[in-house]
A protein has these predicted regions:
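N-terminal glycine-/charge-rich "phosphate-binding" loop or analogous flexible N-terminal tail
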Residues: 1-59
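Phosphate/diphosphate ligand-binding glycine-rich loop within oxidoreductases
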Residues: 56-124
Length: 124
C-alpha cells in the first residue's frame, strides 16, 4: 500500500513537521508552505510545483487553501484547517464534494481562558 500523501500549506515549524512525519511510515508529509506563498505572489514555477503535489494529495492541512483546490487535487479525501471555522471554504463545489472538511474548533478554549485570566490578574 502506498503512503498517504499529506500536503501542508501553512508554515508549522520544523519541530511539529518532524513530529508529524515521524508519526507513521504510512504517511508522506510534504511542506508546501513556501510554494503556496509563492503562488499567492504570482510565481508560476511555485504554482506548477504546487500543482504537482496537489495532484497526488489525499490530505491537505493548513490555514488557507490553494485556489480551485478541488479541481487541482483530484485524489483529495480530507482537508484539515487550522482554524475553528470553515465557513469561508464552503462554496457549492465543496458542499457537493465527497471531501471531508474538518477544523480545530474547541482546542483553543483552555489556552484562551488562561490568557484572559492572566490579563485580569494584571489589574489586581
Amino acid at each position: 500500500m502506498a503512503a498517504i500523501s499529506v500536503v501542508v500549506t501553512s508554515g508549522i515549524g520544523p519541530e511539529l513537521l518532524h513530529q508529524i512525519i515521524s508519526g507513521s511510515p504510512k504517511i508522506k508529509v510534504t511542506d508546501a508552505s513556501n510554494l503556496f506563498r509563492g503562488e499567492l505572489k504570482g510565481d508560476a514555477a511555485a504554482k506548477a510545483k504546487l500543482d504537482s503535489l496537489l495532484a497526488r494529495a489525499e490530505v491537505i492541512y493548513g490555514l488557507r487553501l490553494p485556489q480551485n483546490v478541488l479541481a487541482r487535487a483530484p485524489r483529495l479525501k480530507w482537508i484539515q484547517v487550522m482554524s475553528a471555522g470553515v465557513d469561508r471554504f464552503l462554496d457549492i463545489d465543496m458542499i457537493d464534494s465527497p471531501v471531508t472538511l474538518t477544523n480545530v474548533s474547541g482546542i483553543h478554549a483552555i489556552p484562551i481562558s488562561e490568557f484572559v485570566i492572566g490579563l485580569m490578574l494584571m489589574f489586581v
